[in-house]
């Protein structure tokens, strides 16, 4: 879409906000259009979500729900981005690469579970982690050789603490892998991971746009990073695609995103946190994902060390199911927590 400015004096399509809006609606339309077709195809092929044997009893009714819906919204995101974003911008190219790599990892994992009708039959934990490490390394290596800012910032503080240089690659890999797995753990109830992901993308988009603008970044004491604002187009496309997906994923879900969706969303959130220099603030932006991950760590650690469980079941959303909360109540309350956390994160823009 940006190329249209080369053939006319009308600069309408040169504005990031305009192209982000087009990307949003294109991805939304593609997601809404192709998702029901995919659902019908997946039902015919019996590409259903295998249910964990220890999951709450209410989940057994979901055993016939198709999965791998992430393929559609990632496809919609990439198509909209290719049409609307500046493909000469290396932040955009690496962002698309990140989505493709992690969607592929998730797809392999999903297919293994579906073909064997076993929730444990996908990639082994070791193989999944190795695949995520390789994919993360590819992304951060390209970022580094392209000269990305390697300074380290803390939330609510206007100056960089230090320049980590090449050692920042280790932190960036950790951020992407952790974020990817955190969203994956959260994706256990209808729409639970989708809406907090949208909130996180919107918050990060604000940081991307402001840091990419010389005037705003200087006024707000944000890192000034040329070209970063172009990622808002890619982020807006994913928001639109996720909203289209949510139409079919809200309770009771007609389709699940699968690992192909959750792993790629999480990795992309981690990527946006890295390039916008919000590696630490990402803990607040993705607070619900962090909460879910911590609950699993506490549960596993406590059981291995003390042979006792902290929660009735982990991740923590299953704990609330076990104590009698209905699914919709858990989902909406977690959405509220995610919204509040992102509001606080956005306040940090001014409080520096």
UniProtKB/Swiss-Prot annotation:
It comes from the Bacteria. Its main location: membrane. Catalyzes the initial step of the lipid cycle reactions in the biosynthesis of the cell wall peptidoglycan: transfers peptidoglycan precursor phospho-MurNAc-pentapeptide from UDP-MurNAc-pentapeptide onto the lipid carrier undecaprenyl phosphate, yielding undecaprenyl-pyrophosphoryl-MurNAc-pentapeptide, known as lipid I. Its cofactor is Mg(2+). Keywords: Cell cycle, Cell division, Cell inner membrane, Cell membrane, Cell shape, Cell wall biogenesis/degradation, Magnesium, Membrane, Metal-binding, Peptidoglycan synthesis, Transferase, Transmembrane, Transmembrane helix. Pfam families: Glycos_transf_4 (PF00953). One of its GO terms (cellular component) is plasma membrane. It catalyses: UDP-N-acetyl-alpha-D-muramoyl-L-alanyl-gamma-D-glutamyl-meso-2,6-diaminopimeloyl-D-alanyl-D-alanine + di-trans,octa-cis-undecaprenyl phosphate = di-trans,octa-cis-undecaprenyl diphospho-N-acetyl-alpha-D-muramoyl-L-alanyl-D-glutamyl-meso-2,6-diaminopimeloyl-D-alanyl-D-alanine + UMP. The chain crosses the membrane at residues 10-30, 67-87, 88-108, 129-149, 159-179, 191-211, 227-247, 255-275, 280-300, 329-349. One of its GO terms (biological process) is peptidoglycan biosynthetic process. This is Phospho-N-acetylmuramoyl-pentapeptide-transferase. CDD domains: GT_MraY (cd06852).
